[in-house]
C-alpha cells in the first residue's frame, strides 16, 4: 500500500495519480478537494480502478457527503440562535463540496428562516487555521454587527476563535491556559458564536464543543475500500455514486440528522 499527501494541491494530485498508474498499483483511492480538467482526463483514460471520496464525479466510483443538506441544516440552526447578524467564512467554490455546496446550502438554510447573509459579511479562506484567523480578524475589524461566525471547516473555525481573542484583546487566565482550556475560555467570554463543519474531535476537546456537522468519514473510508476491492475483483463496471448523510451536533435545541 502506498500513501501520498498533497496538501490540497490539485496539480500534485494529478501528478501522483499518474505516478501510481505507472507504478503500477492495483487500485487508487483519491480523497479529493478540487476537481480540475487534469483530474477528469485521468479518470477517463486510466485503466486502474479508482474510487473518489469526498467529491461527486461521473467518471469513477465515488462516495460523497451531503454537503448541501449539511449547509442548509447549519444555516437553519444558526438562524435560530443569531439575534444580530451572521458571517460566513467559506472556501473556494472550485471545491464543489466544501466550497460551493456548503456555501449554497448555508445561504438557503438562512433564507428559509428569513435571514440574509450580506456580501460584506462573507470571506473566503484557505483550508488552514492561519487563514481562518486572518479572515475572521478581517471580518471583526470591519465592525460588522454579527453574533455568529460560521465556518466551512472546523479548522477554519479554530482560527476564527483565536481571531476573536486577538480582536477583544482579553488576557487568558494562567489557569485556563495551563489546563488547555484557552479556546473554551475565549468562547465563554464573548457574545460571538462560532460554528464549523467536520466535528473535529481535537477542537471539541479544547472548546467543549461548537455547533458543527458530523460527516461519516470513517464510513466513507470503509465503503471506499470495499468499492475498490470489488472493482479490482470484477473488472470494469458502471460507476457507482454513493451519497452519505450527516448529523448536526452542538446546536441544541435544533440538533438534527440526515444519515441516509
What spans do the regions from the language model cover?
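Amphipathic helical "hinge" segments at domain boundaries
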Residues: 1-26
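Hinge/beta->alpha junction and helix N-cap segments in small-molecule ligand-binding domains
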Residues: 3-12, 63-73, 89-111, 115-137, ...
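Glycine-rich phosphate-binding loop signature in dinucleotide/nucleotide-binding domains
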Residues: 22-24, 81-82, 139-145
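Short, Asp-centered acidic motifs that coordinate Mg2+ and/or phosphate
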Residues: 26-28, 50-51, 148
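Flexible loop/hinge segments that line or gate small-molecule binding clefts
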Residues: 31-73, 155, 187, 198-210
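Residues that mark the start of a beta-strand
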Residues: 49, 83-85
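Flexible loop/turn connectors
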Residues: 144-147, 156, 161-260
